């Protein structure tokens, strides 16, 4: 986890103005700051140093590479001291290499004459951009950009189950850049990589073959993603976090309990060995505490709580001692985990999932085309674009960044995604949801597959402490939508 910033302006900007923006970005990279400055261009990186040496940052160069990422398979690509060295050479000499990298990445490369930048195709790390007649700003987060420009809100409709945003933000002139797209001197160029190219169904396989393939793949991916330093898991007692625990049994565990909301998280000790219980932080959250942390989240990130679950993510990152935090992000969308998938009336006209029902028609047609007209598979892919890329992934990244934590999401690893995207429908949804993951879970915990409510929050119950008013509808979700919008627009 690092923070990156690039500013290009026609009029000279004083260095203190740039450093003020870097101060906002500092939590993403608390170890040290590096930057290059001229009258017209400022480029910087705040560094969270996890493992390896810092030799790359100490070498003198005329160019500048600002990087936020982790290439888990970097050792496959040659004798590089760190993944940063590999990413730098790829950005400088051969950007096609990024399509072979497994892991999240966002980078900006400035050689003194030309600037190029890009983000990973799965939408895990990202860049925001503001541009007008005088200035262009590219940054890991919105908040530093707002130190340069007038803070003007724009309305972003809340139309899906969560407050999903693709390229738009609730700030005038600030956009999120397209995943996998290369930008050269701020002009969109070719796609470096994209998840559409990852969809290529293979030969028919049996359930046993699929389960064996996942077992081998999961072990390998988790081995490569495991850092040499201590790590933590955002631990709920559910299938996804327990699969991560099976590969990281010594990890620090952080469980957030929205009191009275999730019956599974209150039983997490049943899944754990005695030594693992000693690694567990169990944090019950009251209505007042929820409201307090909700306001802190909005104040730091300058973005809305797009989901009621964001406060739990915020508290997990805040209370984690380890610098690396593993999450189960994207497992439900990729492997068919939501209960609603068993009941949707699938149709080719549009997505009928509550997570993406108001999605862009052109994107829906592209999802349909990727699966040769199969509306079921297209719906899950549409949910990935809206619920993961448009909500959870950027939310998790900026939340982790606020507390100097690097978030690792193994279900968004390229190999795992390719496996999931090409699973036949019956191995995503049948008499149960996400059967592949549940079968894997049952190998370790044969008697503990509990019905899980999922992440929850106290947003509605915390309303008296959130300092906003709404017009009650009698529908908790409609009331939550008012809470999410009013807390952001009336306080920003």
What is the role of each PLM region?
Residues 214-222, 312, 316, 384, ...:
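Alpha-helical packing segments of well-folded alpha/beta enzyme cores
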Residues 236-240, 330, 454-460:
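A glycine-rich phosphate-binding loop feature that marks nucleotide/adenosyl-phosphate handling sites
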Residues 207-215, 302-306, 378-382, 406:
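Short acidic-aromatic active-site loops that bind/stabilize oxyanions
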Residues 1-296, 323, 439:
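Cysteine-centered catalytic environments shared across enzyme families
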């Amino acid at each position: 986890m690092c923070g990156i910033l690039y500013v290009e302006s026609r009029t000279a900007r004083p260095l203190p103005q740039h450093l003020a923006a870097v101060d906002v970005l500092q939590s993403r990279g608390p170890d040290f700051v590096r930057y290059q400055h001229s009258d017209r261009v400022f480029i910087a990186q705040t560094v969270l140093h996890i493992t390896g040496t810092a030799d790359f940052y100490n070498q003198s160069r005329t160019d500048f590479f600002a990087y936020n990422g982790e290439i888990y398979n970097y050792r496959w690509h040659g004798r590089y001291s760190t993944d940063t060295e590999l990413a730098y050479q790829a950005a400088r000499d051969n950007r096609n290499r990024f399509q072979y990298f497994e892991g999240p990445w966002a980078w900006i490369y400035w050689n003194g004459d030309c600037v190029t930048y890009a983000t990973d195709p799965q939408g895990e790390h990202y860049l925001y951009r503001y541009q007008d007649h005088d200035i262009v700003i590219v940054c890991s987060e919105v908040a530093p950009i707002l130190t340069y420009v007038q803070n003007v809100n724009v309305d972003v409709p809340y139309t899906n189950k969560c407050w999903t945003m693709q390229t738009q933000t609730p700030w005038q002139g600030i956009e999120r850049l397209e995943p996998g797209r290369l930008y050269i001197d701020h002009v969109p160029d070719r796609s470096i990589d994209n998840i559409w190219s990852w969809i290529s169904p293979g030969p028919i396989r049996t359930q046993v073959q699929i389960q064996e393939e996942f077992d081998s793949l999961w072990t390998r991916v988790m081995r490569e993603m495991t850092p040499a330093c201590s790590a933590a898991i955002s631990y709920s007692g559910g299938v996804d976090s327990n699969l991560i625990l099976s590969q990281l049994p010594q990890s620090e565990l952080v469980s957030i309990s929205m009191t009275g909301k999730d019956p599974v998280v209150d039983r997490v000790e049943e899944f754990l060995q005695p030594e693992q219980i000693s690694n567990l932080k169990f944090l019950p959250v009251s209505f007042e505490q929820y409201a307090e942390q909700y306001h802190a989240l909005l104040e730091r990130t300058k973005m809305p709580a797009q989901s009621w679950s964001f406060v739990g993510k915020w508290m997990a990152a805040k209370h984690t001692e380890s610098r690396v935090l593993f999450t189960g992000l994207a497992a439900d969308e990729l492997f068919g985990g939501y209960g609603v998938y068993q009941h949707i009336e699938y149709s080719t006209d549009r997505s009928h999932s509550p997570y993406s029902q108001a999605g862009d028609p052109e994107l829906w047609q592209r999802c349909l085309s990727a699966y040769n007209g199969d509306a079921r598979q297209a719906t899950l892919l549409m949910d990935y674009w809206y619920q993961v890329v448009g909500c959870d992934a950027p939310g998790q990244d900026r939340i982790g960044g606020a507390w100097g934590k690097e978030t690792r999401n193994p279900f968004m690893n390229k190999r795992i995604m390719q496996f999931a995207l090409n699973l036949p429908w019956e191995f995503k949804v049948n008499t149960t949801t996400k059967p592949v993951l549940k079968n894997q879970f049952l190998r370790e915990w044969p008697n503990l597959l509990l019905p899980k409510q999922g992440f929850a929050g106290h947003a509605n119950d915390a309303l008296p402490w959130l300092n906003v008013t709404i017009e009650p509808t009698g529908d908790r979700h409609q009331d939550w939508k008012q809470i999410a919008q009013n807390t952001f627009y009336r306080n920003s």
